[in-house]
């Protein structure tokens, strides 16, 4: 808490300094008021002014505000840029910076000079500029054009009432002179004063048909001379509709997915409106929001790029078609229009078929490969595992071994549900039927009932007990081959006493072997021997 008063005092002390920072614009750097620029070069004038709030700047030349209409002048945040300076650009330039607290002005004096040779010195402030030059001490240089890129366009077409500027910026030593001629005739002083505004540029304004011709600039000094010729064509304005010149647009063929273009060249007294249309094929009218009728046919209006003016007075426009499809094929129209009417010309575009059209198998394969790889691997593996488990279970079921010995009755132990009473003998026929059905006989119950008198009464309880014990497994627990070794005769249950009983149970088997007694049952607690 003891630091709070000190912190408050510190903040209060900073407030006056922060308020003091806000104020009128001030100079951030030194400037050189006198600036010298070479003729035809680019010059930059800085305005290093700062302030809080940031000031707004405005440039003036000889008291006239410089604005966007000055084509060679550009006002930048850091200063003023003048391109291709001319002799008339010399003067006093002022940068005025203003904010809510005041204003500040930065003054420049711009001097434009021709190129001078290295051997010639500019006279100093105290030097003398008079006297004759010593030719022996001078290095002469013949004239040369310093801006050849500005002179590439030698054929110029302009309509009546427009203007044009012809440039021949040159340098040399001694300083060259320039003379303008029209159709090899020197322009008189009166004609030159009407047109020429600047030393190296001939400006022709408010052109008339008689201004058409060849204009030549001749630049010379003691070391030599050079010249350049411009052809000016002044087009007489006529009240007529535009005319499509040349052969374009022409029929075109393009590959599927390729790029092509149509071009349209229109001659008009004034800048025309050039528009591209595409004929709507029959049955596809619903694909387009709006259509227009031209000559009784429906067309859709296509996006159109810039219209370029050509030196011969015509106008050019191109329609670009990229990644061509079958829908792009058809008839296209170039329409040129002005206030007096319109003209149009048509051409056809043919799109070759796709050499590799996509097919349904490719789509299905791509969709299948889009499944996660665990699913692709897991489904077949699971199917194989389930199939193997089922096959293994079937094999184990067919090859299941006989019941273990623990299932046999123990001596002195009577299985539950068994009884020695004759009331239990009533189930014997049904059990015998089950035994004989395993051996293929359906008539065994009748034989058992018929031979019931020969078998002792004590046989049924014991036989019933033994059969009941072993039928729940549906397999034979103790078997003996009735047909001897190597016989294919089915095995016989040991619970029968002799062949008579066997034949009574299963008469259809037919072969029982040479032995008369294949087993016996002793009444010793249910043990089988």
Swiss-Prot record:
Region (Disordered): 116-151, 405-427
Residues in the Cytoplasmic compartment per record: 396-529
Residue positions with a glycan: 107, 227, 251, 289
Location within or outside the cell: Cell membrane
Tissue expr: Highly expressed in the kidney, brain and lung. Weakly expressed in the muscle, thymus, lymph node, stomach, intestine, colon and liver. Expressed in fetal cartilaginous structures like the nasal cartilage, the ribs and the sternum as well as in the cartilaginous rudiments of developing bones such as the vertebrae and the pelvic bone. High expression is found in the muscles of the tongue and the diaphragm.
S-S bridge residues: 47-95, 168-217, 264-334
A cellular component annotation (GO) from this entry: Golgi apparatus
Every Ig-like C2-type domain range: 25-111, 143-233, 242-350
UniProt topology in membrane: Single-pass membrane protein
UniProtKB keywords: Cell membrane, Disulfide bond, Glycoprotein, Immunoglobulin domain, Membrane, Receptor, Repeat, Signal, Transmembrane, Transmembrane helix
Gene Ontology biological process terms from the UniProt entry: cell surface receptor signaling pathway; cell-cell adhesion via plasma-membrane adhesion molecules; diaphragm development; heart valve morphogenesis; negative regulation of cell population proliferation; negative regulation of fibroblast growth factor receptor signaling pathway; skeletal system development; ventricular septum morphogenesis
Segments on the Extracellular face: 21-374
Signal peptide: 1-20
Transmembrane parts of this sequence: 375-395
MF terms in GO: fibroblast growth factor binding; fibroblast growth factor receptor activity; heparin binding; identical protein binding; non-tyrosine kinase fibroblast growth factor receptor activity
PANTHER family noted in UniProt: FIBROBLAST GROWTH FACTOR RECEPTOR, FIBROBLAST GROWTH FACTOR RECEPTOR-LIKE 1
Quaternary structure annotation from Swiss-Prot or TrEMBL: Interacts with FGF2 with a low affinity.
Protein function: Has a negative effect on cell proliferation.
Stated name of the protein: Fibroblast growth factor receptor-like 1
Native organism: Mus musculus (Mouse)
């Amino acid at each position: 808490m003891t630091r709070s008063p000190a912190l408050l005092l510190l903040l209060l002390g900073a407030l006056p300094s922060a308020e003091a920072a806000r104020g009128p614009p001030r100079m951030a750097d030194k400037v050189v008021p006198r600036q010298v620029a070479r003729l035809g070069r680019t010059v930059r004038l800085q305005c290093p002014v700062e302030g809080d709030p940031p000031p707004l700047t405005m440039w003036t030349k000889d008291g006239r505000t410089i604005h966007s209409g000055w084509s060679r002048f550009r006002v930048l945040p850091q200063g003023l840029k003048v391109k291709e300076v001319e002799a008339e650009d010399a003067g006093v330039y002022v940068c005025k910076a203003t904010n809510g607290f005041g204003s500040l002005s930065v003054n420049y004096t711009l001097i434009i000079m021709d190129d001078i040779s290295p051997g010639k010195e500019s006279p100093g402030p105290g030097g003398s500029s008079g006297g004759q030059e010593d030719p022996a001490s001078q290095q002469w240089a013949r004239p040369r054009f310093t801006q050849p890129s500005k002179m590439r366009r030698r054929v110029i077409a302009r309509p009546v009432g427009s203007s044009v500027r012809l440039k021949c910026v040159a340098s040399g030593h001694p300083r060259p002179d320039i003379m303008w001629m029209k159709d090899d005739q020197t322009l008189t002083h009166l004609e030159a004063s009407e047109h020429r505004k600047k030393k190296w540029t001939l400006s022709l304004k408010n052109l008339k048909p008689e201004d058409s011709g060849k204009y030549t600039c001749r630049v010379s000094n003691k070391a030599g001379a050079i010249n350049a010729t411009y052809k000016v064509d002044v087009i007489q304005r006529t009240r007529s509709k535009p005319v499509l010149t040349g052969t374009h647009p022409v029929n075109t063929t393009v590959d599927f997915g390729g790029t092509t273009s149509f071009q349209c060249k229109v001659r008009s007294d004034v800048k025309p409106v050039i528009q591209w249309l595409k004929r709507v094929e029959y049955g596809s009218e619903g694909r387009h929001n709006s259509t227009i009728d031209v000559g009784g046919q429906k067309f859709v209006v296509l996006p159109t790029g810039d219209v370029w003016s050509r030196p011969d007075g015509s106008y050019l426009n191109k329609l670009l078609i990229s990644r061509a499809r079958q829908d792009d094929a058809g008839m296209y129209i170039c329409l040129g229009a002005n206030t007096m009417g319109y003209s149009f010309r048509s051409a056809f575009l043919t799109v070759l078929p796709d050499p590799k059209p996509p097919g349904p198998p490719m789509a299905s394969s791509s969709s299948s490969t889009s499944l996660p790889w665990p699913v692709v691997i897991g489904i077949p593996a699971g199917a194989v595992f389930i199939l193997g488990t089922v096959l293994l279970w079937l094999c184990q079921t067919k090859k299941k071994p006989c019941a273990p010995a623990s299932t046999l009755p123990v001596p002195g132990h009577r299985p539950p549900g068994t009884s020695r009473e004759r009331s239990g003998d009533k189930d014997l026929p049904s059990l015998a039927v089950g035994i004989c059905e395993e051996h293929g006989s359906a008539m065994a119950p009748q034989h058992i009932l018929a031979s019931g008198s020969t078998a002792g009464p004590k046989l049924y309880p014991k036989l019933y007990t033994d059969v009941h014990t072993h039928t729940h497994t549906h397999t034979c627990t103790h078997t003996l081959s009735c047909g001897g070794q190597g016989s294919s005769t089915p095995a016989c249950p040991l619970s029968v006493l002799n062949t008579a009983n066997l034949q009574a149970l299963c008469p259809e088997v037919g072969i029982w072997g040479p032995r008369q007694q294949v087993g016996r049952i002793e009444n010793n607690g249910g043990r089988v021997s």
